[in-house]
Amino acid sequence: MSGMSICFAMREAVEWILHLDPVFMHVGPLEIRWYALSYVFGILFAHWHITKASQCLALDKKFLDSLMLWAVIGIILGGRTAYILLYNPSFYWEYPSEILQTWHGGMSMHGGYVGCIIAVSIVCKKHRVRVMPVLDLCACAAPLGLFLGRMANLVNGELYGRATTTCLGVVFPSSGDLVPRHPSQVYEAMLEGLLPLLFMSILARYTKVRLRFGVLSHMFGAWYGIVRCAVEFFREPDPQVGYIAFGWLTMGQVLSAPIAVVGIFMLVLTVLREKPREGVADISA
């Protein structure tokens, strides 16, 4: 099978997903959307993964249930607040009733990232548990949620890429033109979701990286920040924001660069300073 044939096959798969109905099913007057399901299954996977992986940390069920609840709240509040303030403040100032209508879309990954860290830190402090090993668990579970979320963006026909003449170019009806564009949602799903999920799972399972608390969480932050900055060059900027500067710098890059820098710095610092643990670790604060 030639490279061109593979390219066209990938495009056909993307187009098939793109033309799915954003509403998965109706239950009476209630619409169940693919986007909502991406959150549900991402949360369920995170709960399963964290519960299973936490056995080596001797974390009790009460703590884990509290952790999942507040992590989800932190992601939603952080993601929604950041989107409102950074991406579309004038719209929500004019239509404040839309603030609570999250099913209409409008979430920021960067806000969700910060919100989750804050929520996890608060829960850990309350239960007198060290933060970094718990964030490591969250970091290994997060990529699947990112993968599902980006694929749901594709179903919604949103966050599409810039114009391209390559064989991967797809026409997005929501763009308002017939110009083939990069399926940037798929790029992000693979590079921010599937690839780090596989890579970090291998590291956590088959290497001693997991014994150095903080390495996995800082690695995820560095990975996401770098990849997001790169993929933004293929993604059309949000129309209500446009380019921030230089005719190419986007809001996504402005927010991702600090995450990458801090992640790299903390990763190096952790590798140099954190001593590996053996067996069931005591992570009491």
Curated annotation (Swiss-Prot):
It is an enzyme of class 2 (transferase). One of its GO terms (molecular function) is phosphatidylglycerol-prolipoprotein diacylglyceryl transferase activity. Keywords: Cell inner membrane, Cell membrane, Membrane, Transferase, Transmembrane, Transmembrane helix. Pathway: Protein modification; lipoprotein biosynthesis (diacylglyceryl transfer). The chain crosses the membrane at residues 30-50, 67-87, 103-123, 129-149, 184-204, 213-233, 252-272. One of its GO terms (biological process) is lipoprotein biosynthetic process. A 1,2-diacyl-sn-glycero-3-phospho-(1'-sn-glycerol) binds at residue 150. InterPro entries: Lgt. Its main location: membrane. It is a multi-pass membrane protein. Its EC number is 2.5.1.145. It is found in: Cell inner membrane. GO terms for cellular component: plasma membrane. Catalyzes the transfer of the diacylglyceryl group from phosphatidylglycerol to the sulfhydryl group of the N-terminal cysteine of a prolipoprotein, the first step in the formation of mature lipoproteins. Belongs to the Lgt family. This is Phosphatidylglycerol--prolipoprotein diacylglyceryl transferase. The lineage of its organism: Bacteria, Pseudomonadati, Pseudomonadota, Alphaproteobacteria, Rickettsiales.
